[in-house]
Structures are given as C-alpha cells and as structure tokens.
Amino acid sequence: IPVLEDAEPMATGPFTPNWESLKTYEVPEWFRDAKFGIWAHWGPQCVEGSGDWMAREMYMEGTYKYNYHREHYGHQSEFGFKDVLPLFKAENWNPDELVKFYKEECGAQYFFTLGNHHDNFDLWDSQYQEWNSMNIGPKKDILDGWARAAKKAGLPLGISFHADHAWTWYEPSRRFDMK
C-alpha cells in the first residue's frame, strides 16, 4: 500500500482488513496464562502532565487542558502542540530499570507500550513521516528502547497504535495553530 505515489509501500502482514482474516488470529500461548501486565502509555502527551488527550483538548476552550496550557505556556496560537513536542526529551528515561521494576516489583508477566498516540507522533525512527521521536524531542527510538528492555527482562512485548482518531484529532486546533 503506497503512502504517496513515489513512496515505498508500507509493510503488509498476514492479515487483511476483514473479520474472516481476523478470526484466523491465534492468541499466543503465553497470553493465556499471563494474568497481569503493564502498559506504558507514555509519549509527548505527558509533557504537560495534564492527561493523554492533551494534544486535542488543549485547543478546546473551557476544558482543564485548555486552561492549563494557557496558564503554563501561553495562548495556543503562539505555543501549540507542535511547540510542546520538542519539550518531550526523555532525558531521565531508563527503560531497563523501569521494565525490571515492572517485572520484579509489580509482578508484570508482559509489557505493552504506546507506539503512536492519536497525536500521530511515532515513537520510533519512522520511515513514513518526520513527526517521530528520532527527529523531534528526545532524538531516541523509544520503541527500540522498550523492546530491548522487555527482551532483557524476558517479558513478551506488545505495541499499541491509536490511529482511530488520527483524521480528526487536531480539528479543534484549526482556530489557533495557523503554522
């Protein structure tokens, strides 16, 4: 599936977008026995500390996130989400230490992490777009760090993608962020 006419096609997998194909999926054996896992829902939406829908709700007048952003960063037309992204630096992030803690202290039997939130910011070195953690913010492949840490700890890894709202996620920003 080409993203653009001259672009490299996206990788395809064993499934097609229909129910019959999805029914052929077999749940991994480890998952049947795993009773507890940790999901790290962490990315640039955490910069402000106001919640995971920050990139959308910071543009919705009257919401807590809108008011929080105005108070701490100024008007959204002058400092929008694109300006928040470079503040996501992950300078104190230690995936080995965190995953070890999740397993040994919390009892996690698997680890999931966020690959891309509704904000369309890829947490890996994406070949399909420049809005990713290698080009903006931490300059690190966050997914690779989590994957290596999970493997080192012997935990199965899952990655979640939240593209369901991607097409309409930034609609509230159109009145503010003109760049």
Map each language-model feature to its residues:
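Mature catalytic domains of secreted/periplasmic carbohydrate-active enzymes
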Residues: 1-179
